[in-house]
Amino acid sequence: MFVKTGDKVKVIAGKDKGKEGTVLSINVKKNRVVVKGVNKIKKHQKPSQTNANGGVVESEGSIHASNVKVISKKEDK
């Protein structure tokens, strides 16, 4: 895959077109990436022992790798 974790990318298609962020994770089999601050989704959580309050939790969802363009690569050590 042309994108690696830590690369800075720009979204070129979809509802978040034009936004920039860093790649948090990659799913190679499904060809999808999770970008920080892009494609925010809300999940409703029931109260449980680990999460006593429950409520609405907001996190990043994955987007298809073809919808992002690499701006700068992560510098290797």
From Swiss-Prot:
Name the CDD domains for this protein: KOW_RPL26
The alphabetical list of record keywords is: Ribonucleoprotein, Ribosomal protein, RNA-binding, rRNA-binding
Q: Which first-to-last residue range defines the signal peptide?
A: none
A single GO CC term, please? ribonucleoprotein complex
| Top-rank taxon | Bacteria
Give the GO terms filed under biological process for this record.
Answer: translation
**Pfam families xref list:** KOW, ribosomal_L24
Similarity remark: Belongs to the universal ribosomal protein uL24 family.
Question: What does this protein's UniProt record list under function?
Answer: One of two assembly initiator proteins, it binds directly to the 5'-end of the 23S rRNA, where it nucleates assembly of the 50S subunit. One of the proteins that surrounds the polypeptide exit tunnel on the outside of the subunit.
What's the protein called, per UniProt? Large ribosomal subunit protein uL24
- In its UniProt entry, the species of origin is given as Lactobacillus helveticus (strain DPC 4571)
Q: What is the phylogenetic placement of the source species in the record?
A: Bacteria, Bacillati, Bacillota, Bacilli, Lactobacillales
